[in-house]
Amino acid sequence: MTVNLRDLSRTIAEFAFLTALVCNSLLIYLTARRTKNITGAYKYMIILFALLGLIFSCTEMLARPFVHNFNASFVYFSLSNDLSEFKSLVQMLLVLYSGLYSSLISFVAVQFIYRYMVLVNANLLESWFTGWKLVFWVFYVIFFGFAWSASVYFCLFPDTYSYNYIRTEFKDVYNIGVDRVAIFILVAYEKHPSSEEYKLRPASVIMIAGTISILVIQYSIMLFCGASMHRQMNEKLKNFSPDNQRLQKQFFKTLLLQISVPTVLFHMPIFPVLLGPFFNFEISAESGIIYSLFSLYPPIDGLIIMTVVTDYRIALTELFLGSHSGAQVEVIPVEVVSILNFSLL
């Protein structure tokens, strides 16, 4: 039995949207009203990240992004039937979707910076994450989202050569003309009409270099902060009580999951899609299923926080079983208040 990847993509996206709607809404409610130890800037960061995840999932449902790899090209287009008559609108949704993806990754990097400062220097944390200075981090997230969106719009906007390159392939596979759908096209090489030589298309190189640079920047931040925190945390744990050591281990486990899950599910699979055209293999693949996996990230991140962090588990128990269920919120002692006052735990 042949699996229809487009139908499977739709099913995954719908499941992810409903899951994100439930998980992220619950996370926002618990963070705002139920948790006891999550305060300060990080409280708002969790809420904003959950909201951004919801917007990402909603945009995915409207745009229905899909990708097709064909020889020296990949095609980023929409499978949306509901908005098919509004081609320009769907194009903007595709651009927005790519930008939101970049913003989500950048937001995770900001959380790593925050947690790193929590352990290194509380005064440094106050200098960078209080008052109007929080606006800087908002612009940080927006900047990288805009940069990714701009690279898609300006570098992949189809021209005559790219249209003609994938026209027959697109018609054969999807039974629709490329002129009728919201579409962006990367063609790595262009054949010179007289010499028959293949030359790199500058716009394609700029797009790939730009998007990979964004990922490298965010991952460098996360890896540096994560490794530094791990080294310093081991030393600091010696002075903590057993309860606080357990809390710190939960904290570090959350970090590991937040960086490893998107790496395995989203970032590793996307590299063959992005770089494949530059190898100019003879290939025809409906690789858009990867974009459906992207939509799973918002609910997964929410589930990680709510299942790993004790404060959320207690809040969930009280919410569904009542306040007399026996769950108790741990009191953070004075010995670690300077560290945990601004942190997730």
Swiss-Prot record:
Detected in ALM and PLM mechanosensory neurons and head neurons. GO terms for cellular component: plasma membrane. The chain crosses the membrane at residues 12-32, 38-58, 93-113, 134-154, 205-225, 259-279, 289-309. It is found in: Cell membrane. It holds the Pfam family 7TM_GPCR_Str. Residues 1-11, 59-92, 155-204, 280-288 are extracellular. Residues 33-37, 114-133, 226-258, 310-345 are cytoplasmic. Glycans are attached at residue 71. It comes from the Eukaryota. GO terms for molecular function: G protein-coupled receptor activity. Keywords: Cell membrane, G-protein coupled receptor, Glycoprotein, Membrane, Receptor, Transducer, Transmembrane, Transmembrane helix. It is a multi-pass membrane protein. Disruption phenotype: Locomotor defects with hypersinusoidal movement and frequent adoption of a spontaneous coiling state. Mutants also display a hyperactive egg-laying phenotype in which worms are unable to properly inhibit egg laying, laying early stage eggs which results in the retention of fewer eggs. Increased tph-1 expression in hermaphrodite-specific neurons (HSN). Its main location: membrane. Belongs to the nematode receptor-like protein str family. Regulates egg-laying and locomotion. Likely to act upstream of goa-1 to suppress 5-hydroxytryptamine (5-HT) biosynthesis in hermaphrodite-specific neurons (HSNs) through inhibition of tph-1 transcription. PANTHER family: SEVEN TM RECEPTOR (PTHR46000:SF6), SEVEN TM RECEPTOR-RELATED (PTHR46000). This is G-protein coupled receptor str-33. It comes from Caenorhabditis elegans.
